[in-house]
């Protein structure tokens, strides 16, 4: 009894626009030579992901001339109400609030050579002690106001520390000095 092996090369054609010339078509898996009823997949790369046809309009954040701060740093300064909500979120998660300040560099910078190191620009001075047992956001905001009076030209951030896991869970700039021009 003779057996024969049937082989057929699967050829996929992709219709591309000039903007998609450098993109790679999605992998559709191995083609089956058996005649199973299957639905034909569209090989057009625009069917993979879409944002409503506005692909040409997307932009990235400009990397030059923008200082890197903490979480929420791309937003305008927080109002007192927004700040209270952030601190309440921190407290609701069981994190210990703590204030830190930096009088000269409120952003990541390279101090120890020309290659980025984890600790470059990340050591800030702690304002007093962590606020263990704090349950009211107004206590944290009162400490923030006190730190602003003591160091009006410093960047001040609020961090939330998880004392069970021993990690910092949240950190955001709460005050930027008036001399800093965003």
Swiss-Prot record:
Subunit structure comment from the entry: Heterohexadecamer of 8 large and 8 small subunits.
Gene that encodes the chain: RBCS1
Family designation: Belongs to the RuBisCO small chain family.
Protein name per its UniProtKB record: Ribulose bisphosphate carboxylase small subunit, chloroplastic 1
Biological-process GO terms, alphabetical: photorespiration; reductive pentose-phosphate cycle
Induction: The most highly expressed of the 6 small subunit genes.
GO cellular component: chloroplast
Compartments, as annotated in UniProt: Plastid, Chloroplast
Keywords linked to the UniProt accession: Calvin cycle, Carbon dioxide fixation, Chloroplast, Photorespiration, Photosynthesis, Plastid, Transit peptide
Primary localization: plastid
GO molecular function, one term: ribulose-bisphosphate carboxylase activity
A Pfam short name: RbcS
Keyword hit for Plastid: yes
Further comment found in the protein's record: The basic functional RuBisCO is composed of a large chain homodimer in a 'head-to-tail' conformation. In form I RuBisCO this homodimer is arranged in a barrel-like tetramer with the small subunits forming a tetrameric 'cap' on each end of the 'barrel'.
Role noted for this protein: RuBisCO catalyzes two reactions: the carboxylation of D-ribulose 1,5-bisphosphate, the primary event in carbon dioxide fixation, as well as the oxidative fragmentation of the pentose substrate. Both reactions occur simultaneously and in competition at the same active site. Although the small subunit is not catalytic it is essential for maximal activity.
Organism: Mesembryanthemum crystallinum
InterPro entries noted in UniProt: RuBisCO_ssu, RuBisCO_ssu_dom, RuBisCO_ssu_N, RuBisCO_ssu_sf
Interval spanned by the transit peptide: 1-56
